[in-house]
Curated annotation (Swiss-Prot):
Purpose: Catalyzes the phosphorylation of the position 2 hydroxy group of 4-diphosphocytidyl-2C-methyl-D-erythritol.
Pfam families reported for this sequence: GHMP_kinases_C, GHMP_kinases_N
Active site location: 23, 148
Keyword Transmembrane: no
The name this protein goes by in its record: 4-diphosphocytidyl-2-C-methyl-D-erythritol kinase
E.C. number: 2.7.1.148
One GO MF term: 4-(cytidine 5'-diphospho)-2-C-methyl-D-erythritol kinase activity
GO BP terms, alphabetized: isopentenyl diphosphate biosynthetic process, methylerythritol 4-phosphate pathway; terpenoid biosynthetic process
Organism per entry: Nitrosospira multiformis (strain ATCC 25196 / NCIMB 11849 / C 71)
SUPFAM superfamilies on file: GHMP Kinase, C-terminal domain, Ribosomal protein S5 domain 2-like
Keywords in alphabetical order: ATP-binding, Isoprene biosynthesis, Kinase, Nucleotide-binding, Transferase
Length: 294
């Protein structure tokens, strides 16, 4: 474990420190497109123990204040602030919150960092404000914040359909991942609008299925436009002992799956000069799973 997946309560009434774990898409199929332009997907989300850390402090004046703004992102557009204000408005609570974010998950890499931060904000403030909201209530708010937010609120590894809102829990075998971070920023909108994108992959029937059946339909489009992603992925695919290698989301991050920590760390020690990466363990469920009742 990376040690950051800890949840602490200070004075149990006024402060919370909570992780926001990253996710991997073990496969991602584009199976159609709605009339409104949204793409219909099938994917398996795997939570991993590499995480941002968020700290929340109770405020009696109702103000939501982010003390660690992201450069270039107006505070009112920050996903943590939007999540806090949405929950505050929908619940009618008079409480506010101070929010501090320790960012570790690379931005724009397909690891779901911003979405995970938003979900952790919903789950943590549900606890801090003593709202007692059930998970299905929080899940109704999640799509307003982003397509990947629901799975983090769902708090389990999941098979997802639709635009990511139809979620079924899925049991996945223990695994460790070597995750590489190519030095490029992939435009998700550009990838989904590409004429080269396959949008008619035959849907997988569940159950049963195996992640080995899958692939990432976005991968060929991204690799053609971003050679660095292709180079990193090609290196992963020649590793001995890797059960699979793929791109997560719309990139740019790519990963290889191993059965053991030693296998993943051995591969990390072999990465070529100029490549960067880290090892993460697959989780069975979100560390804040119990912050909302089923």
């Amino acid at each position: 474990m990376n040690g950051i997946l800890s949840t602490t309560e200070v004075d149990s009434q006024a402060e919370l420190s909570c992780p926001a774990p990253a996710k991997l898409n073990l496969f991602l199929h584009v199976v159609g497109r709605r009339e409104d332009g949204y793409h219909l997907l099938q994917t398996v989300f795997r939570l991993v123990d590499f995480a941002d850390q968020l700290h929340f402090g109770l405020r009696a004046d109702g103000v939501i204040k982010l003390h660690t703004p992201t450069p270039g992102v107006p505070e009112e557009q920050d996903l943590c602030v939007r999540a806090a204000k949405l929950l505050q408005r929908e619940s009618g609570t008079p409480w506010g919150a101070n929010i501090f974010l320790e960012k570790r998950i690379p931005m724009g890499g397909g690891l779901g960092g911003g979405s995970s931060d938003a979900a952790t904000t919903l789950l943590a403030l549900n606890r801090l404000w003593k709202l007692g909201w059930r998970r299905n209530q929080l899940l109704k708010l999640a799509p307003e914040l982003g397509a990947d937010v629901p799975v983090f609120v769902f708090s389990e590894n999941a098979f997802a359909e639709g635009i990511g809102e139809k979620l079924l829990p899925i049991a996945l075998p223990p695994a460790w991942y070597l995750i590489l971070t190519p030095p490029v920023h992939v435009s998700t909108a550009k990838v989904f609008s590409s004429k080269e994108l396959t949008r008619n992959t035959i849907p997988i029937k569940i159950p049963p299925f195996s992640t080995e059946q899958g692939h990432n339909d976005l991968e060929p489009v991204v690799c053609a436009s971003y050679p660095e992603v292709a180079r990193h992925l090609e290196w992963l695919r020649q590793l001995e002992g890797a059960r699979m290698a793929a791109m997560t989301g719309s990139g740019a991050c790519v990963f290889a799956e191993f059965a053991t920590e030693s296998g993943a760390r051995s591969a990390l020690g072999k990465i070529p000069y100029g490549m960067k990466g880290f090892v993460a363990q697959g989780l069975d469920r979100h560390p804040l799973h119990d912050f909302a009742e089923q």
